């Protein structure tokens, strides 16, 4: 697919993020409404979306895919954390909390809101199911290694991971696939789920934009052009290249390689700022990282996806 074709797919979803930001700054979604939307998204919309894409997905009856996908996802996050921690001092960040916040936000990319619709448009519906299983590894790295960087490693973080509704939905859907096989969801249930699935991604992107706008003051207070430069350099260039170079030589399915190409191209995850804020990290550094990589991503995402897919093909 060409640069212009991928950009055309990406643009409406980015518009939802900016719309979410605008409603926050106008006071429409600020505070409690934003938190309610976020809770509804994580606990209801995402689990329904997962069941829709995973149950009955033939690609997920292959045990090789089910094992390899989370491992590749885990690696993609951990390599980002390692590269970020190893280079953070070159971007003017000296304090421990700021370094951890920088590495956390640079290392975790936007692995759901933007990558899911792009994957479906480019690779098809079955690839989305594999991507969601791939995200098990991302969630594991996020809540273990990532939160460990911010707070110290603990069993409590792993317990929080296991109580995560999207993760429960993935494991339950995979269990249905292997135990029963075939698409066990009746047509009438699919029709009920359809509007929920259609709404899930735009709502997720919308609330992400609102959350980022909520912390816009942190972005304004601290210039930090060197931090922004480092975030874009690592998240949008160095880490994607490492991820795709690695997956090129791994004995995994072509579909998983293509999914990695899409995921590697993503900017820093927007909701990471909520986690950094919750655990007492450096919100200013996190805001800069997310904002600058998201803006850069509007132009680099189509470029990288088109290039990576040509290389992997």
Predicted regions span which residues?
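Alpha-helical transmembrane segments of multi-pass small-molecule/ion transporters
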Residues: 1-313
């Amino acid at each position: 697919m060409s640069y212009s074709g991928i950009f055309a797919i990406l643009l409406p979803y980015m518009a939802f993020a900016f719309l979410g930001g605008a409603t926050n700054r106008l006071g429409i979604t600020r505070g409690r409404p934003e938190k309610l939307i976020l809770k509804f998204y994580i606990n209801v919309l995402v689990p329904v979306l997962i069941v829709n894409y995973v149950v009955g997905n033939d690609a997920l009856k292959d045990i090789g895919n089910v094992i390899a996908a989370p491992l590749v996802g885990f690696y993609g996050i951990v390599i980002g954390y390692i590269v970020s921690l190893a280079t953070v001092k070159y971007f003017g960040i000296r304090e421990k909390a700021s370094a951890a916040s920088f590495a956390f936000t640079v290392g975790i990319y936007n692995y759901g809101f933007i990558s899911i619709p792009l994957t479906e448009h480019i690779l098809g519906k079955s690839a989305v199911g594999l991507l969601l299983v791939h995200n098990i590894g991302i969630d594991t790295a996020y809540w273990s290694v990532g939160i460990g960087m911010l707070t110290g490693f603990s069993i409590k973080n792993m317990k929080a991971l296991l109580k995560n509704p999207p993760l429960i939905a993935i494991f339950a859907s995979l269990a249905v696939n292997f135990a029963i096989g075939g698409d066990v969801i009746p047509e009438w249930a699919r029709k009920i789920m359809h509007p929920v699935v259609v709404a899930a991604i735009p709502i997720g992107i919308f609330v992400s934009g609102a959350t980022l706008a909520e912390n816009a003051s942190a972005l304004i207070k601290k210039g930090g052009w060197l931090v922004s430069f480092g975030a874009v350099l690592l998240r949008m260039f160095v880490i994607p290249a490492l991820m795709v170079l690695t997956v090129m030589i791994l004995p995994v399915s072509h579909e998983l390689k293509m999914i990695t190409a899409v995921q590697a191209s993503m900017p820093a995850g927007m909701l990471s700022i909520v986690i950094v804020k919750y655990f007492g990290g450096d919100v200013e550094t996190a805001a800069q990282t997310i904002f600058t990589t998201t803006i850069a991503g509007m132009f680099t995402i189509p470029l990288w996806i088109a290039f990576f897919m040509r290389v992997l093909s």
